[in-house]
């Protein structure tokens, strides 16, 4: 059975996703997840039967509602990473890129209403994944989102510039900045840093795994030996962080980190977690920025070794990734002696792609030959006859070597006879006096 649901599609940062009102989706989490899996077409590498796009950057969903339980916030936001070949929905991490579209969606759907004279709108967001707060500032004109704020030749359509302030980013998943209690650990012969700020990330130096940091994602994704080793490290890191078996989770993430160029602080290849990101996650960049100022972390060691490293007072880092550069500004805590970051500031852009109606199926209502289709106006036994006519005359066994079409040709006359009989019964059920079928052939 098909169920319609309205959605808005945005390109948000370097991701694309579908945005839904929470009230439009099933309330029970398992039913909600089943609906999202159906909408995105998960289970096929191209998600050809849905909206996912066959890529982790586009198989994303934002679920938004008015924040009725928390008066200090405008909206609640739940991020869902939907599997591609695997049929799953992971709500453990936040997604900063997709969050950049939440303010636009909240305004478009009437959850937030700017004054007609406002030129910017502040939207206060409570993230249900990390249980943390963020603020988004978006340009508006006459009470609507101003998508013409950016007109960049590198963008396919006009976009709105969004400022994101991540508040209290420490311990997004584990409640601790250093989940293992250490700034660095050794796993599988590698020195790593496991940091939880905005999202849990395992940092590994690029040269320790034999890469330069200039490799294309496709090159790294083809390196099965590297991917296998990174997954071993990630699984052990998850155990040490207290997350248990993370083989079925998208956290912790992995970042292969190295020194940047003359104009950037770092180069990074970010894994999501079993494939290299085509760009870089915003939350991962925030974690990188925080890790850069944690004494003893591998990220801090890289920063400290560079003559052009930014000063602690600037608290701004830039990360070169496969698609460009991502900058993060940091607001240090009131107690400067602490190696913590209270607020991280990032700028993204958001482009409106479509307001649309999509459809999802209810799994237990899918038709099969074991449960024939019936309707009030047509006798059920008529459908049973018609279904029987189209079933294979001979069911191939495991030892059959003939192709299915050869079996169909060999039993052509039997199949025609069955269809003819079914047609007789169908017409007769509606009171017709004759239902001869003649000159039929199978092509």
Swiss-Prot record:
GO terms for cellular component: cytosol; nucleus. InterPro entries: PrpF-like (IPR007400). It is found in: Cytoplasm, Cytosol; Nucleus. The keyword Oxidoreductase does not apply. Keywords: Cytoplasm, Isomerase, Nucleus. Pathway: Secondary metabolite biosynthesis. It comes from the Eukaryota. Its EC number is 5.-.-.-. Disruption phenotype: Abolishes the production of itaconic acid. Pfam families: PrpF (PF04303). Signal peptide: none annotated. GO terms for molecular function: isomerase activity. Belongs to the PrpF family. Aconitate-delta-isomerase; part of the gene cluster that mediates the biosynthesis of itaconic acid and 2-hydroxyparaconate. Cis-aconitate is secreted by the mitochondrial tricarboxylate transporter MTT1. In the cytosol cis-aconitate is converted into trans-aconitate via isomerization by the aconitate-delta-isomerase ADI1. Decarboxylation of trans-aconitate by the trans-aconitate decarboxylase TAD1 then leads then to the production of itaconic acid. This is Aconitate-delta-isomerase 1. It comes from Mycosarcoma maydis (Corn smut fungus).
């Amino acid at each position: 059975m098909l169920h319609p649901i309205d959605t808005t599609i945005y390109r948000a940062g370097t991701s694309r996703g579908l945005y839904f009102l929470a009230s439009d989706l099933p309330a029970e989490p398992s039913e909600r997840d089943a609906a999202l899996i159906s909408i995105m077409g998960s289970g096929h590498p191209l998600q050809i039967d849905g909206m996912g796009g066959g890529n982790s950057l586009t198989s994303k969903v934002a679920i938004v509602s008015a924040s009725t339980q928390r008066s200090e916030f405008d909206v609640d936001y739940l991020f869902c990473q939907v599997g591609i070949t695997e049929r799953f929905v992971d709500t453990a991490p936040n997604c900063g890129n997709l969050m950049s579209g939440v303010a636009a969606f909240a305004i478009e759907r009437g959850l937030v209403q700017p004054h007609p004279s406002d030129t910017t709108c502040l939207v206060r967001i409570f993230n249900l994944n990390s249980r943390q707060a963020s603020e988004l500032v978006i340009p508006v004109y006459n009470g609507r989102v101003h998508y013409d704020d950016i007109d960049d030749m590198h963008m396919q359509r006009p976009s709105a510039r969004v400022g994101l302030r991540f508040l209290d980013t420490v311990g997004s998943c584990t409640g601790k900045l250093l989940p293992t209690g250490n700034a660095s650990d050794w796993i599988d012969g590698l020195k790593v840093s496991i940091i939880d700020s905005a999202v849990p990330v395992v940092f590994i130096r690029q040269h320790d795994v034999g890469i330069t940091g200039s490799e294309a994602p496709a090159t790294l994704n083809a390196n099965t030996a590297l991917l296998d080793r990174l997954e071993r490290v990630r699984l052990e890191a998850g155990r040490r962080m207290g997350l248990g078996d993370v083989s079925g989770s998208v956290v912790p993430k992995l970042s292969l980190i190295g020194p940047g160029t003359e104009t950037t602080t770092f180069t990074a290849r970010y894994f999501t977690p079993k494939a290299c990101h085509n760009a870089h996650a915003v939350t991962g960049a925030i974690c990188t920025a925080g890790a850069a100022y944690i004494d003893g972390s591998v990220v801090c060691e890289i920063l400290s070794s560079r003559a052009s490293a930014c000063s602690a007072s600037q608290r701004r880092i830039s990360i070169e990734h496969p698609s460009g550069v991502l900058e993060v500004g940091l607001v240090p805590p009131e107690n400067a002696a602490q190696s913590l970051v209270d607020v991280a500031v990032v700028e993204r852009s958001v482009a409106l792609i479509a307001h649309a109606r999509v459809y999802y199926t209810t799994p237990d209502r899918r038709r099969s030959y074991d449960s024939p289709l019936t309707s009030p106006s047509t006798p059920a036994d008529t459908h049973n006859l018609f279904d029987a006519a189209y079933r294979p005359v001979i069911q191939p066994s495991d030892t059959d070597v003939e192709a299915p079409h050869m079996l169909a040709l060999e039993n052509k006359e039997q199949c025609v006879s069955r269809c003819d009989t079914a047609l007789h019964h169908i017409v007769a059920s509606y009171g017709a006096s004759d239902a001869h079928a003649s000159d039929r052939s199978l092509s």
